[in-house]
Amino acid sequence: MPPLWVVTELMTFGELSRWFALTKDNKVKSAVAMDLGLPNREVLEGTLQLLSYIRNICAHHGRLWNRQTVKRLPNIKRFRADLVIVEAVVDGGVQAQPANFIYNALVVLAYMLRHQSADTSFVQRAVDLVQTRSAEQLKAMGFPIDWRSRPCWSI
């Protein structure tokens, strides 16, 4: 039997997300979440679902940049200073929830990557790319006006 890391490298992102969701050992799920810098397994499961959804849009050449995602990030208090929060209807009531734009997914991805590798170039490359876009395009992607001054994007 090959080591687990070999198996996971052969999985698609969707398969990995579903495999994680079907894992019964919550201690393992919590350990993986902590290893990625996320507070708990529920947040990791929701984040994996969103990232899998976004990956599929990209893989099938779908329009992503100005699209609201069907999946929404879970509330992550640790990242609240960076996330764009909106009032959303949840289970018949109105709650503060992360907005379902690509911006919030990029925030969580940046935090996860930095947690794994402090010297990741993802944040710098994302900033460089985003700064080539117009204010209207940034707004359509859910970027707040002050995005560059938020902690996540400090370089």
How would you describe each model-predicted region?
Residues 1-155:
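Long, contiguous internal "core" modules enriched in hydrophobic/ aromatic residues
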